[in-house]
């Protein structure tokens, strides 16, 4: 519970000595007529995302042909995406059918913590997968030696640790603020919408959020970009056309996921303040939080031959 006072002209419309104990999401308040349709669409996407990621994790675990570093990282990404989806979608769906209950400050902080943790973990897992593709293409003879079990675990733990550290930093900085309003203009407890409810100037918090966003998006993007520059330069040196096609094919799924993931995340968290409507900002958030997690199983199922073959073996009951 936080006690806040009138602060400057910007707070004139807010009550003095307001006691805030919970928040109410207002993300879809302007879509009354479309709420049932949106519920059906998001429910379908939710089920597909969970089913797709669970199938990928199960297939990788059961099929010995997929017990390689590349698919180890894919299973970790699918697991992270599954939890990420569970953090946001259930409450969002309940709000669309009028069953949304106020969320306590502790509940909001918890949701924000897991959202940030797994969102950033996903970014660095994609970076680790980029390094894995670099080693596979540029140093194939030593691939299994370099990408040994110890290094793979270290890369995954590193990604998770960065996510945890950033989440603790962000959540602590946001929930130290005094709040004077309880209506969150969003469909979950994201950092910026919650900060807007504060009675005091949040410039320092906004600068901190921007710096962290740059570090956890631009740095991984840069590393992936460097990896693919080296990968492409190596592939172009391959003499046979068939060899080049095969090398490109091993990277196509990862590159597709990387482009969409980082593009959506950058638009959502690195774009400057503008006169965009709330609906426009929410559309970007929906794309990043609902559509992107579905992309991983769809791309790797439709574009990756080894995963498709493993699914065929699973259906045919021919696991190794």
Curated annotation (Swiss-Prot):
What is one GO biological process annotated to this record?
A: single fertilization
Q: Where are the transmembrane segments?
A: 37-57, 66-86, 111-131, 151-171, 208-227, 248-268, 282-302
- Which regions of this chain are Extracellular-facing, per the record's topological domains? 1-36, 87-110, 172-207, 269-281
**Cross-referenced SUPFAM superfamilies, in alphabetical order?**
Family A G protein-coupled receptor-like (SSF81321)
How does it sit in the bilayer?
Multi-pass membrane protein
- Please give the positions of the paired cysteines in each disulfide bond: 108-199
All ranges on the Cytoplasmic side of the membrane = 58-65, 132-150, 228-247, 303-320
An example of a Gene Ontology cellular component annotation for this protein is: membrane
Localization, UniProt: Cell membrane
- Ribonucleoprotein in keyword set: no
Query: What GO molecular-function term can you cite, just one?
Result: G protein-coupled receptor activity
Q: Which InterPro entries match?
A: GPCR_Rhodpsn (IPR000276), GPCR_Rhodpsn_7TM (IPR017452), Olfact_rcpt (IPR000725)
Q: What does this protein do?
A: Odorant receptor.
Protein family per UniProt: Belongs to the G-protein coupled receptor 1 family.
Name of protein? Olfactory receptor 10J1
């Amino acid at each position: 519970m936080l006690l806040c006072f009138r602060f400057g002209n910007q707070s004139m419309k807010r009550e003095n000595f307001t006691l805030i104990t919970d928040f109410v999401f207002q993300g879809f308040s302007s879509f009354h007529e479309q709420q049932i349709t949106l519920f059906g669409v998001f429910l379908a996407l939710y089920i597909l995302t969970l089913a797709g990621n669970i199938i990928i994790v199960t297939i990788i675990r059961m099929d010995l042909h997929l017990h390689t570093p590349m698919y180890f990282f894919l299973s970790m990404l699918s697991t992270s995406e599954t939890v990420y989806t569970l953090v946001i979608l259930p409450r969002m769906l309940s709000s669309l059918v009028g069953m949304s209950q106020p969320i306590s400050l502790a509940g909001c902080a918890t949701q924000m913590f897991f959202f940030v943790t797994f969102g950033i973990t996903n970014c660095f897992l994609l970076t680790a997968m980029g390094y894995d593709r670099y080693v596979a293409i540029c140093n194939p003879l030593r691939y299994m030696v370099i990408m040994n079990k110890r290094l793979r675990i270290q890369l995954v733990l590193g990604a998770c640790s960065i996510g945890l550290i950033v989440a603790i930093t962000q959540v602590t900085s946001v929930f130290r603020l005094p709040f004077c309003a309880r209506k969150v203009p969003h469909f979950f407890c994201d950092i910026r919408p919650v900060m807007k409810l504060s009675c005091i100037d949040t410039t320092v918090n906004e600068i901190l959020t921007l710096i962290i966003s740059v570090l956890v998006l631009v740095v991984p993007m840069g590393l992936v970009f460097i990896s693919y520059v080296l990968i492409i330069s190596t592939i172009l040196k391959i003499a046979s056309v068939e060899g080049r096609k095969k090398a490109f094919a091993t990277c196509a799924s990862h590159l597709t996921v990387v482009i969409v993931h980082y593009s959506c995340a950058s638009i959502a968290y690195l774009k400057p303040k503008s006169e965009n409507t709330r609906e426009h900002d929410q559309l970007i958030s929906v794309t990043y939080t609902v559509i992107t997690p579905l992309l991983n199983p769809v791309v790797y199922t439709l574009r990756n031959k080894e995963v498709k073959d493993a699914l065929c073996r699973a259906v045919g009951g021919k696991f190794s």
